[in-house]
């Protein structure tokens, strides 16, 4: 779209990216070796050097990822011809078994195998040997060009209750692509089938509803193309609000379509979803004939498909692998645990070392430190330790009241345990 810079800005930012960066920075901090341990761990310098190298690699990978994503955004589609070869084979048909029965002189019908037929669908892209881009498609498997292939067998569901609809779906990692599709079913009669092909396109194209298509003047298109045509319509009819540029004042056509007087432009891609439908599949009718003189005759169909740069599928698979960093996170978590264990061991070492050097002084300092912590827990209440050494301190009314409540609590717990024991019996 030539005038993207003039489109109203979305203004809505998701916090997911910031949260991810915050979590990542926190993990980096947790994996840092404390300065107090640098001199005591000989391998610390090597670890820091590895961290510097990791940061450089991360920066390089991020830049390359942005470059790859930018290359995917460029439209590099080309219309090519896919030649399909469709034929059928049969087995155990009556005309095949007639000769076998005469040879075997067998009159037992129940012993005869069940008749069946097999539909074969294959195809390859017609390439120009002199075109470097076409050479990349020369060995591409037939199903690689489709996201879904469906076969509808047009026969009675009462006589053949199962298997009259077959569907193949492409996996995200392209691991189930092949040079053809075969479907085998039981049957001794000729039957019509409907082969429905759903080409794989990036970005995906959509069919517009009749009302939406009449407004934009197009019948189908990708999401960016549809938004671009809608923006051109808005500019041509001067529907953009003069004060709030992100608001669109609907004319009669848009008002009837969206059922609103004004539209918030950043929400238009979401609002137009109800007026978009998947592109109709390429439908090929074919008749499976089980008669003796028509089987294995190949029928050829040429269909036009939009193909993209073959490297784009590899780039998508690579980017999907890059985004899945479960193994790296697991290693980072393990490093964090090791750093925490080292820090804890160092604290224990410092504790025991000070104690061994001067036990009395260390114990006094430790008790004083614990006392300060206790004061903080008690909200800074001053504690007179000399007063606590006197017996009169424990004869105050609050002591008796606390003891009374404590004994009541013990008694209640004992009664509850007795009740629970009797209930179990």
Curated annotation (Swiss-Prot):
Region of interest (Disordered), ranges? 1-23
Question: Which PROSITE patterns does the entry mention?
Answer: SWIB_MDM2 (PS51925)
Q: Which domain of life is it from?
A: Eukaryota
Q: Where is the SWIB/MDM2 domain?
A: 201-278
* Pfam families listed in its UniProt record: SWIB
Xref: InterPro entries = SWIB_domain, SWIB_MDM2_dom_sf, SWIB_MDM2_domain
- CC terms in the record's Gene Ontology section: chromatin; cytosol; nucleus; RSC-type complex; SWI/SNF complex
Q: What keywords is this UniProt entry annotated with? A: Chromatin regulator, Cytoplasm, Nucleus, Transcription, Transcription regulation
**SUPFAM superfamilies registered for this protein in UniProt:** SWIB/MDM2 domain
Provide the protein's localization.
Answer: Cytoplasm; Nucleus
Residue ranges annotated as compositionally biased, kind Polar residues, are: 1-16
Which GO annotations describe the biological process of this protein?
chromatin remodeling; regulation of transcription by RNA polymerase II; transcription initiation-coupled chromatin remodeling
Q: Tell me, how does this one assemble?
A: Component of the RSC complex composed of at least arp9, arp42, rsc1, rsc4, rsc7, rsc9, rsc58, sfh1, snf21, ssr1, ssr2, ssr3 and ssr4. The complex interacts with histone and histone variant components of centromeric chromatin. Component of the SWI/SNF global transcription activator complex composed of at least arp9, arp42, snf5, snf22, snf30, sbf59, sol1, ssr1, ssr2, ssr3, ssr4 and tfg3.
Q: What does the protein in this record do?
A: Component of the chromatin structure remodeling complex (RSC), which is involved in transcription regulation and nucleosome positioning. Controls particularly membrane and organelle development genes. Part of the SWI/SNF complex, an ATP-dependent chromatin remodeling complex, required for the positive and negative regulation of gene expression of a large number of genes. It changes chromatin structure by altering DNA-histone contacts within a nucleosome, leading eventually to a change in nucleosome position, thus facilitating or repressing binding of gene-specific transcription factors.
| Family listed | Belongs to the SMARCD family.
Q: Which PANTHER family match?
A: SWI/SNF-RELATED MATRIX-ASSOCIATED ACTIN-DEPENDENT REGULATOR OF CHROMATIN SUBFAMILY D
UniProt-recorded name of the protein = SWI/SNF and RSC complexes subunit ssr3
């Amino acid at each position: 779209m030539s005038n993207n810079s003039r489109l109203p800005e979305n203004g809505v930012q998701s916090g997911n990216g910031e949260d991810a960066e915050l979590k990542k920075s926190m993990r980096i901090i947790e994996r840092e070796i404390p300065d107090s341990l640098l001199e005591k761990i000989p391998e610390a310098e090597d670890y820091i050097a590895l961290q510097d190298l990791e940061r450089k690699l991360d920066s390089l990978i991020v830049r390359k990822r942005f470059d790859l994503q930018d290359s995917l955004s460029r439209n590099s589609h080309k219309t090519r011809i896919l030649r399909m070869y469709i034929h059928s084979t049969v087995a155990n048909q009556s005309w095949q078994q007639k000769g076998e029965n005469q040879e075997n002189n067998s009159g037992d019908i129940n012993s005869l195998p069940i008749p069946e037929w097999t539909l074969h669908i294959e195809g390859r892209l017609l390439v120009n040997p002199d075109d470097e881009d076409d050479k990349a498609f020369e060995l591409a498997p037939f199903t690689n060009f489709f996201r879904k292939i469906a076969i509808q067998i047009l026969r009675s569901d009462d006589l053949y209750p199962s298997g009259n609809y077959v569907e193949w779906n492409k996996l995200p990692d392209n691991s189930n692509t092949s040079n053809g599709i075969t479907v085998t079913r039981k049957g001794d009669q000729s039957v019509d089938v409907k082969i429905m092909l759903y080409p794989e396109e990036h970005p995906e194209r959509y069919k517009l509803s009749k009302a939406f298509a009449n407004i934009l003047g197009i019948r189908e298109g990708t999401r960016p193309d549809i938004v671009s045509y809608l923006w051109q319509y808005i500019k041509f009819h001067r529907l953009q609000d003069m004060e709030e540029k992100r608001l669109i004042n609907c004319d009669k056509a848009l008002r009837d379509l969206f059922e609103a007087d004004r539209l918030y432009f950043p929400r238009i891609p979401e609002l137009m979803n109800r007026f978009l439908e998947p592109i109709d599949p390429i439908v090929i009718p074919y008749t499976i004939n089980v008669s003796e003189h028509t089987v294995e005759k190949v029928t050829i169909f040429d269909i036009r498909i939009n193909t993209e740069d073959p490297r784009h599928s590899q780039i998508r698979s690579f980017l999907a692998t890059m985004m899945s960093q479960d193994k790296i996170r697991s290693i980072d978590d393990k490093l964090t645990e090791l750093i925490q264990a080292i820090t804890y061991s160092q604290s224990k070492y410092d504790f025991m070392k000070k104690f061994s050097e001067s036990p009395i002084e260390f114990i006094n300092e430790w008790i004083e430190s614990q006392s300060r912590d206790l004061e903080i827990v008690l909200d800074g209440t001053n504690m007179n330790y000399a007063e606590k050494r006197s017996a009169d301190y424990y004869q105050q009314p609050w002591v008796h009241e606390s003891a009374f409540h404590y004994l009541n609590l013990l008694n209640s717990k004992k009664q509850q345990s007795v009740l629970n024991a009797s209930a179990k019996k």
